[in-house]
Amino acid sequence: MGSILIRQIAESHPERVSSMIMGGAIMKLNFRSQFLIRFGNIVKSIIPYMWLYSFLAFIIMPKKNHKKSRLLFVREAKKLYRKEFIRWYKLTSELNPLLRFFRQVDVKIPTLYVMGQEDYMFLPSIKKLANLHKSAKLVVIPDCGHVVNVDKPSIFNEKTLRFLRKLN
């Protein structure tokens, strides 16, 4: 969700943003993610929200090497109260029009997308977006899932610092 916030700030106040780094960016909800959101909407008031969150974490980050990211994801979710979680979940179901706009409009701000090679839900759309937007660059980190800065922190830092140095 951080990539959505960053991009919204860039749209609203481009004078405040000189560059953007998006790790594990979400710019399109594919069929699978839309199905999961709809499924979650149906069961969110029936099952404990942490079960739903843990299930979603496993679907997004299914591999053994994603375990650290999955556990972090769930641990941070425990800080949310059920009411906050329901509000956050409702927001995700309203994202499609905003994400479509983000994909269609290049903000012309240098942007680095850092994605995990195993981020099967969100990498395909970022590949397309990086090809369409002239200001965007894509780095794909091997053996890495959705939360690239946790799965491979040293490689993530190296790639992002290199991007920032090239801008200066």
Where are these regions (language model features)?
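Conserved alpha/beta-hydrolase "acid-adjacent" motif
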Residues: Y120-S125
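Catalytic active-site module of serine/aspartate enzymes centered on a nucleophile-bearing elbow/loop
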Residues: K134-N168
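Short beta-strand/loop motif that positions the catalytic acidic residue
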Residues: V107, Y113-M115
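Conserved alpha/beta-hydrolase catalytic His-Asp/Glu region
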Residues: F31-S33, M50-V105
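Gly/Ala-rich beta-loop-alpha elbow adjacent to hydrolase catalytic centers
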Residues: G2, I6
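Flexible "cap/lid" loop of the alpha/beta hydrolase fold
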Residues: R7-S12, R16-I47
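Cofactor-binding loop segments of dinucleotide-utilizing enzymes, especially the Rossmann-like FAD-
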Residues: A25, G116-Q117, D143
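Short, conserved loop/helix-junction motifs that constitute active-site signature segments
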Residues: Q104-K108, N131-H133
